[in-house]
A protein has these predicted regions:
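Structural/interface elements that position substrates and couple domains in central-metabolism enzymes
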Residues: 1-436
Length: 436
């Protein structure tokens, strides 16, 4: 099938590449001509495990193409995916200008029936808005479909190729048949393609992300209570996770959620509720807890150093909002770095993938280490902010010899408490006993 993907950000590139992998002819379009040229030459502009191989293979086999010309991209496409940014506006609502602008441009170019699919995360009612914009600019027949993505950064290729479900919002029979055909190779093991109306589909995406964010904030609250009552959050997590009604996933406490989805989507859903005169109290609490949780580790650091961080040097392991990605959008590490710098501290950081993005954002306000151990040199303490696998089993002998003080503030609960006792560390984690 011939497909066009408008937008070559994270969602657009994963979508386009994975659709090409099953034999579709895919043209991805982006207004950034320099980026398009780079991709035409086989250079992948994002880091995502497993994507580079598929990306390069489908370019070589001439199933994946890139252009900056919208007319060229959609000319023969039967389905057009909109994978465009919907950044939060000043009031927290999603900015639909990119989506609606693309819809208008596409409408003016239509010559035959096509299916327009919103892959971006959009508020309820967006499909209706896209339809109105397009009808004002064309008399050619078309269908607008909601098909939200449920990709997890770090495992996005697997999520697309073997989805646990595909949600499609459409009441158009032709569009339904086309989407069922398109996704059939990805659901051969029986995972469902769930068809529904457009508004339910749009809300499903926001509801899913907001529920997961709620689980995270709830467990962070439990972790904070554990520290006060002398309980261990890891034991509590195991105890409640064994209940199949709750499940084991998204029960890890830490320093708050980040990334391109959860913060934006929770805020947008709360704003959508507000616009419909509904006070979504739980989501307000979820956001409040998350902001507070980002400050927890710095407060612990300040208490240890008696409130004076001026002239102190801190090593930081982890900058990305989660492991296996270079994405730093709303990363807790950025908030923690800002607080430490404002307190007069110096920082040496290491992250396997995200240092370039951080340097592009904040420049030389901090130093960037060649490896995790270089970051420890002359450091008064180590802060662990992202649970990269490389940080889970470090060379403790090298740590002992390199750190100025054997002091660790662990925002991801990576290490066994008994081991840290045996090594003679001051070890302050989240929701567990303080080792001092």
């Amino acid at each position: 099938m011939k497909i066009a993907v408008v937008g070559t950000g994270y969602v657009g590139l994963v979508t386009g590449t994975c659709l090409a992998e099953t034999g579709n002819q895919v043209v991805c379009v982006d207004i950034n001509e320099e980026k398009v040229k780079m991709m035409q030459e086989g250079q992948l502009p994002i880091y995502e495990p497993g994507l580079e191989l598929l990306f390069y293979r489908n370019i070589v086999q001439k199933r994946l193409h890139f252009t900056s010309n919208l007319a060229e991209a959609i000319a023969e496409a039967r389905i057009i995916f909109l994978a465009l940014p919907t950044p939060p506006g000043g009031d927290g609502s999603a900015d639909l200008s990119y989506v609606l602008g693309a819809a208008k441009d596409i409408a003016k170019l239509l010559t035959d029936y096509k299916v327009i699919v919103t892959k971006s995360t959009v508020p309820v009612g967006t499909a209706d808005k896209v339809t109105v914009v397009m009808k004002a600019n064309t008399e050619v027949e078309f269908a607008v479909v909601s098909n939200p993505e449920f990709l997890r950064e770090g495992v996005a290729v697997e999520d697309f190729m073997k989805p646990d479900r595909v949600v499609v919002g459409t009441m158009d029979d032709r569009a339904r048949k086309l989407l069922a055909e398109l996704y059939s190779p990805y659901v051969r093991q029986g995972n469902p393609v769930i068809f529904m109306d457009e508004r339910s589909s749009e809300l499903t995406k926001y509801a899913a992300n907001s529920f997961l964010a709620t689980k995270i904030s709830f467990m962070n609250e439990i972790a904070n209570l554990c520290e006060l009552v002398g309980a261990d959050v890891d034991m509590v997590r195991r105890g409640i996770g064994a209940d199949e009604r709750i499940g084991r996933r998204f029960l890890f406490s830490g320093i708050g959620y980040g990334g391109s989805c959860f913060p934006k989507d929770v805020q947008a859903l709360a704003k959508s509720a507000e616009e419909h005169k509904y006070d979504f109290k739980i989501l307000k609490s979820v956001m409040e807890v998350n902001q507070i949780q980002k400050q927890i580790l710095v407060e612990k650091v300040k208490r240890y150093f008696n409130g004076d961080l001026k002239g102190k040097k801190f090593a930081i392991w982890g900058l990305a909002f989660k492991p296996e990605t270079d994405d730093i959008r709303e990363a807790p590490a950025l908030y923690i770095i800002e607080d430490l710098l404002n307190a007069g501290a110096a920082i040496s950081a290491f992250d396997p993938e995200a240092m370039k993005n951080v340097k592009n954002l904040i420049g030389d306000k901090i130093s960037y280490a060649e490896d995790q151990y270089e970051a420890l040199k002359k450091a008064d303490a180590l802060l662990i902010l992202t649970e990269w696998p490389v940080f889970r089993t470090p060379d403790f002998d090298q740590m002992d010899a390199t750190l100025k003080n054997k002091v660790v503030f662990d925002g991801r609960n990576l290490y066994d408490l008994e081991r840290m006792i045996d090594r003679g560390y001051y070890y302050n984690s989240i929701g567990r006993k303080l080792i001092s």
